[in-house]
Amino acid sequence: MRRLFSSLLFALVFAFSLCLQTSLAQEDPHAAHMAVGYVPREILERALPLRKGVGAVNEKVTTSSTEAQAFYNQGVAYLHSYVWIEAARSFNHALRIDPKLAMAYVGLSRAYSGLEDPKAAREALGKAEALSAGVSEREQRRIAIRAKQLDAMADLPNAAKHLAYKKAIDDALAADMNDSELWLLRGNAEESTAAGRGQRGSAASIAFYERVLKVSPDNFAAHHYLIHSYENLNRVQEALKHGAVYARLAFSVPHAHHMYGHDLRRDGRVEEAIAAFRKADELEHAYYKSENILPDYDWHHPHNLDLLSTSYQYMGKVKEAERLMRETIALAVVSDYREFNKKEWPAFLLARGRTAEALEASLVLAKGKYAGARAIGHVYAGHALLALGRTPEAIDELKAAEKDGQELPRLGAMVTMSSLEPYVEGLRAETYLRSGKMKEGRDILKEVMRKLRAVPGPDAWSQGLFRLEAIARTAREVGDWELAEYAARQMLDHDPAYAGTHYALALVAEHKRDKVAARKAYAAAEKYWRNADADLPELSQVRANAQEQSSTR
């Protein structure tokens, strides 16, 4: 009865979130003009104060007002932390003080791209261009750079346009080698597409951000982007170093604490990571209360909750993990990325053995707004149906996932075909395993595991760990102990500090009648689950099996 209520509650929450997304359009036929992306324009135009702890920026622009200059700098600081709403508010406030501040329109254009509104971004740039005759040559070059970027963003597969964007920055740098904002842009531009904004940097980006630190040693933005770049290279210790600095220099920004939490978790310091994610959450809730802004409009809030909830799941605190996940799914969907990441909920339910609930949640997701969410909903519905022994229906879900997946772009900043592909292939492989085609399923899953582990970034790292665990669990269920051992050893290589890793290894050792290895693995699992829920079923099994192993020594 309780689980039936949970399923009904989830459906109601999802329906409410859809209502929130469409309410503006229903209330006013001109609602599209009243919002930028997914945020009401009224919010973006609200006045705000100058704030401390958001990161220091000192980029001189053409204005006679020191106050307008200060709000412009604050807007740029918020851009570098992806705080799109407050960046837009800061730039709009600067324009109220000085309507001819052309660079504020460039800032608005960048903020509007962050809010996923290319039309509004282009319109804001047009206003900057209209004012360009009255600004310095340096600012004129920046306006031209933004135009090149928008052209390239409108045609992401076009390598020539991406190259033209990078060349425009290079030409501007030739005229001013000490412009830290240009060096930051150049690092962003080194990403795989012109939409790069510091999240997907690599070894090539690092040199540009290191150059910024030579020009501006306490540049918080460079530290922020270096965290992402080092994470993408799996250089956790370097990322941690920059994360600590970013959190110190931008102490009022939730994302700064969140970023530090990323790598504390990767370093095995999960309780410290939880404290960092909690700090971000506290700052966010204080902001929503003081500014009277719904958390639904803040892209960062559900993202932070995702990492916080899965950190609790990692520790075996599944009750708190579930509470936080329910808080997340209650938020309105504002982007394809956000809706796609609602997959964490059915994945969690499957991991907890709550298959019927997982199927219900997956089918809701399969009716989502965006193709990526619909596809991943079908994938998890397929996994749930296979667990329930309903293979023909699971195959139908696989076909539906493939169909929706065809709508996804090959390139982009959010959900792409490559984001979905390992999940679809994982479902295909499970249909083979449960149909007796062990070799076919095993071969596919080994490649899936390789791809999951190759995806960079902290989100992918934790999601990959739980997917490896799910594969190991499925392998045990179908009696493929060779695959179960392979998956468990992949988990060990991926994260030796996870209790679930040692639990999976213990079950394999027990099956092989290797009492010494089983006893060692059970002891490690119990150690790492030392702060887990007291009634965690896996922990109870670990203790019972460990006791049995000891009694038969």
Task: State the predicted function of each range.
Residues 73, 107, 143-148, 185, ...:
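"A position-specific structural signal for the A-helix of alpha-solenoid helical repeats
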Residues 81-82, 115, 159, 193, ...:
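Structural motif corresponding to the intra-repeat A-B loop/turn of tetratricopeptide repeats
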